[in-house]
Regions:
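Non-catalytic, solvent-exposed segments at the cell envelope interface
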Residues: 2-401
Length: 401
């Protein structure tokens, strides 16, 4: 990881053949939406005529009780979804990925990356059908992790997983799958709580996708078009792309979203790459016939089955009408502000103003203690810092560094 001095981030320029009744059709459309929203990682919800094709297949998608029945919920009809991209080189049972897969991922051995949540995006979908907002949380933000003190926000998952497994082993548990499954549940609980405490807003649902899942998603979509402002080449991630628009396969797409070396703002530029990829994937699902191809839909289902975990009981039927505009471009991504860079326990971290971050999220979602507050000089001054983290809009193929 690059070495950062304590400097301002501004200076680190980074989609039935048979007839259906309306009620039954809605149920099936909702189930299709449930699959697609996870696979695109920004909830691609749409009621396609091919919904019947996957109807009986969706129960195989992993589910989790980590959110908790008593967790705070949004009270205004809107929905907040935490999207977690897990940087592990292992499958859901803790087994190492095959060597040929690791080679394609250009991600090194299964010992690298641990269980870091290297991608964290809070997606806010308003109740009125307005523009959805995606808030990217830089993975190295120094925050309070319950039970573990201050550390990088991405580490909450792995720290809690390791602690849970140690406790289980002390109780005599030796079954590897049980250790993996219960450890991951503890990790999800900790990551959700850490993000919720940091942002000060409810988390209604979550979706987790693995590193290999991201790779397989891009392949299942038959490539995703992206756009770069400048040519890049990086031996660490495997990124080697010319400037301009280009279509990337799964291996290339993973390199595109993982590169940070050689980018002027390092991790912050990588975050914008992730946002641009998601915006492009949404646009592609809506525009190139993904939802009319049974073969492609089956491929997407298989990606979800092996690589995606959702919170249990996610009833999407009530959510379809809210989110139906996402694939039409009514979504915008922004990166939450970073004050400076420093060292913590020998590692590079982002220093953040939690009050500013909370205010930014709460005001833009209309939730929390700061919702509805306007007009202060302090708030107007805060808005200027948005210039250092330009927004990424949906509805096309955005160009990024």
């Amino acid at each position: 990881m690059p070495q950062h001095r304590a400097v301002s981030p501004r200076s680190r320029r980074h989609r039935a053949r048979r007839r259906q009744s309306p009620a039954r059709g809605l149920s099936r459309r909702a189930r299709l939406g449930r699959t697609l929203l996870v696979l695109t990682a920004v909830l691609v919800l749409c009621g396609g005529a091919a919904a019947w094709y996957l109807y009986r297949e969706l129960d195989s998608i992993g589910s989790s009780a980590a959110l908790g029945a008593d967790a705070p919920k949004s009270k205004d009809g809107s929905t907040n979804i935490l999207l977690m991209g897990l940087d592990t080189r292992k499958d859901q049972n803790g087994e190492e990925l095959p060597g040929d897969v690791l080679k394609k991922l250009h991600a090194g051995s299964s010992d690298i990356g641990g269980y870091n949540a290297n991608t964290l995006i809070l997606l806010h979908v308003p109740a009125d059908g307005g523009k959805a907002k995606g808030f990217s949380i830089p993975r190295d933000d120094l925050v309070d992790i319950p039970g573990h003190g201050q550390d990088k926000i991405k580490k909450a998952y792995g720290l809690a997983k390791a602690a849970a497994e140690t406790k289980l082993r002390g109780e005599g548990v030796t079954d590897g799958r049980k250790l993996e499954h219960e450890g991951r549940e503890a990790g999800r609980q900790a990551q959700i709580r850490t993000v919720r405490d940091f942002l000060g807003v409810p988390i209604d649902h979550f979706a987790e996708i693995s590193l290999s899942g991201f790779y397989r998603l891009a392949d299942a979509l038959d490539g995703v078009e992206v756009c770069l402002n400048h040519a890049v080449k990086d031996r660490y991630s495997g990124a080697d792309f010319p400037a301009g628009k280009q279509e990337l396969d799964g291996q290339q797409a993973l390199a595109f979203v993982r590169q940070r070396h050689g980018l002027e703002r390092g991790d912050l530029d990588r975050t914008r790459r992730q946002q641009a990829f998601l915006a492009s994937a949404l646009h592609q699902v809506n525009s190139v016939g993904t939802l009319t191809s049974p073969t492609r839909l089956l491929d997407l289902k298989n990606v979800a089955k092996d690589n995606v975990v959702l919170d249990e009981g996610w009833g999407v039927s009530s959510f379809v009408q809210q989110a139906k505009n996402l694939t039409g471009g009514k979504v915008e991504f922004t990166t939450l502000p970073v004050e400076s860079f420093a060292k913590h326990n020998g590692e590079d971290v982002n220093i953040v103003d939690r009050d500013l971050v909370r205010r930014r999220v709460q005001e833009q979602t209309g939730q929390g203690a700061h919702s509805g507050r306007t007009g202060s000089a302090k708030h107007k001054a805060d808005e200027k810092s948005d210039d250092s983290t330009p927004k990424v809009a949906g509805g096309g193929v955005p160009c990024v560094d």
